[in-house]
């Protein structure tokens, strides 16, 4: 229907169009100076020394794991309540994903669950900053330091998120997403931040065929036209067309996230009169980026299942999302790990629903969602 309200929509405007035109007019549309500008700007946001732009957060996760030397027989700890790309990258490298449970009310991976899963084969810990809220980094990094295990933060939801006064990423290595539904977007893209120069160099090489330089380096730096392969790599570089859009979006980040926060506050107020349960907020000091606004639909409490609620909202022209179906319940992973049970993850996976939340959402859009929820709840 023409008036369908999606659960997410990118906030694009004249600034993004102008940024694209500038790149097209420049004659250099693939990886180049706009990537360098984006990386520098993102370092200013997070406080890191290095940033490496990539074609997606999935690509960033892949090469970050490779740069750590993750391979056959290694174990990587991550929550099952995450997008499956992280698990896929672990498996494709020959390593074993060790999926752990999350807090029932915040859906955050807990240090207790992580520590219980650590073995001599554990080579990385990947906490997820879920829905725009931060995981408990002090406790998680303390575990990493105690056991000598690197931490890679999955910050796909966390552009604009802070933990105890510091932007996500400032503690070490984090991977952000610029996918179309994220807080800032360039259609597809991502960025890895780190303070380790050797790690950053490995990422730059792995993202571009294993070469020590990219096409812009050779064009602008007067280097030899044929660089050497240092180790086999991939084609994960971000075109300047995308980087320019991401830069324009980054300049709007505070305003975009402020609007998200305002809508989330309205949702919280409205939910007081409805049976649907929003996620609880973490107890530690933080700034929430409000990538998603998630409710839990428990049939015993709400009189309707989550799937029925989503179907009913769809008939009313309102879109919703599911973030996420637990990874260990997906066909490949449930067959590979048939005895794995994660009670709090599974309880939530069957009940969570993402409501519409995006910066261009109007008051009328919001009222429409709340009216529909009241109708479904029989109020």
UniProtKB/Swiss-Prot annotation:
Gene3D superfamilies registered for this protein in UniProt: Aspartate Aminotransferase, domain 1 (3.90.1150.10), Type I PLP-dependent aspartate aminotransferase-like (Major domain) (3.40.640.10)
Which reaction(s) are listed as its catalytic activity?
UDP-4-amino-4-deoxy-beta-L-arabinose + 2-oxoglutarate = UDP-beta-L-threo-pentopyranos-4-ulose + L-glutamate
Q: Which domain of life is it from?
A: Bacteria
Q: State one Pfam family annotation.
A: DegT_DnrJ_EryC1
Output one GO MF annotation: pyridoxal phosphate binding
Cofactor needs? pyridoxal 5'-phosphate
Q: In which pathway does it act?
A: Nucleotide-sugar biosynthesis; UDP-4-deoxy-4-formamido-beta-L-arabinose biosynthesis; UDP-4-deoxy-4-formamido-beta-L-arabinose from UDP-alpha-D-glucuronate: step 2/3; Bacterial outer membrane biogenesis; lipopolysaccharide biosynthesis
Question: Does this UniProt record's set of keywords contain RNA-binding?
Answer: no
Q: Name one GO cellular component term.
A: membrane
Q: Which residues carry this modification: N6-(pyridoxal phosphate)lysine?
A: 182
This protein's UniProt keywords: Aminotransferase, Antibiotic resistance, Lipid A biosynthesis, Lipid biosynthesis, Lipid metabolism, Lipopolysaccharide biosynthesis, Pyridoxal phosphate, Transferase
Query: What EC number(s) are associated with this protein in UniProt?
Result: 2.6.1.87
Record-level GO BP terms: lipid A biosynthetic process; lipopolysaccharide biosynthetic process; response to antibiotic
Q: Which SUPFAM superfamilies match?
A: PLP-dependent transferases (SSF53383)
- Kindly state the subunit structure of this protein: Homodimer.
Sum up the protein's function in the record's words.
Catalyzes the conversion of UDP-4-keto-arabinose (UDP-Ara4O) to UDP-4-amino-4-deoxy-L-arabinose (UDP-L-Ara4N). The modified arabinose is attached to lipid A and is required for resistance to polymyxin and cationic antimicrobial peptides.
Family named by the database record: Belongs to the DegT/DnrJ/EryC1 family. ArnB subfamily.
PANTHER family recorded for this chain?
Answer: TRANSAMINASE, UDP-4-AMINO-4-DEOXY-L-ARABINOSE--OXOGLUTARATE AMINOTRANSFERASE
HAMAP family in the cross-refs: ArnB_transfer (MF_01167)
Q: What is this protein called?
A: UDP-4-amino-4-deoxy-L-arabinose--oxoglutarate aminotransferase
**The species this protein was found in:** Salmonella newport (strain SL254)
Gene name as annotated: arnB
